[in-house]
Regions:
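Structured helix-beta-strand junction loops
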Residues: 24, 61, 83-84, 110, ...
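CheY-like receiver
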Residues: 57-58, 106, 128-129, 162-163
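Short acidic/polar capping segments at secondary-structure boundaries
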Residues: 122-125, 143-146, 157-159
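General beta-strand structural signal in soluble alpha/beta enzymes
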Residues: 67, 87-89, 116-119, 138-141, ...
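Conserved ATP-binding module of the ATP-grasp superfamily
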Residues: 113-115, 136-139, 150-172
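ATP-binding N-terminal substructure of ATP-dependent carboxylate-amine bond-forming enzymes
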Residues: 1-102, 124
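Glycine-/Pro-rich loop/turn segments that contact NAD(P) or position catalytic residues
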Residues: 95-136, 151-154
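Acidic/polar active-site rim loop that often engages polyanionic ligands
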Residues: 85, 106-112, 140-147
Length: 172
């Protein structure tokens, strides 16, 4: 009996997972957000990955559930795990992909090598980081960025003044 893999998200990573899975004899189901997505030809369902009931219905009949992006809400994945759905990687791992500051703190706690970084919450904090690190930094929004969105190379805190309202930034 073949294993059935459910992939939440119909983007490029889902598309890249399909062929190797099929070669291994794995049946693949895809929950795409809309019909025009990269993996839409293999999609067996279309719906909102943020809606628990949509994802719950999709997960029925799959042996393992995964995702092709980090934007699936923690509460959705945790509810599925509580329902007995095998989710891999699990919500505890996903949180580090969802929050760059959390990831940096975890890597630091493990003693892993990484670039110098700081959590900054205002222009003064960013200016201090710039002064200590050669006057330029890569600044990232901790959540929601992808494919260059939420990333700026800056030499002045004013270049990210519009981002400080999100509460905290990652400076590297």
């Amino acid at each position: 009996m073949a294993l059935t893999l459910g992939i939440v998200g119909g983007g490029q990573l889902a598309r890249m997972m399909i062929a190797p899975a099929v070669e291994l004899g794995v049946d693949v189901r895809v929950l795409a957000e809309e019909p025009g997505m990269a993996a839409a030809l293999a999609a067996t369902a279309t719906g909102d990955y943020r809606d628990l009931e949509t994802v719950r219905a999709f997960a029925r009949g799959v042996d393992v559930l995964t995702f092709d992006h980090e934007h699936v809400p923690q509460e959705v994945l945790r509810a599925l795990v509580a329902d007995g759905v095998r989710v891999h990687p699990g919500p505890d791992a996903l949180q580090f992909a969802q929050d760059k500051l959390l990831m940096r703190a975890r890597l630091a706690g493990l003693g892993m090598p990484q670039p110098e970084w700081a959590r900054v919450t205002d222009a003064a904090g960013l200016q201090s980081f710039l002064d200590e690190h050669g006057g330029r930094a890569v600044v990232k929004t901790p959540r929601g960025g992808y494919d260059g969105k939420g990333v700026r190379v800056v030499a002045d805190p004013e270049e990210v003044a519009d981002w400080f309202d999100c509460g905290e930034l990652l400076a590297e």
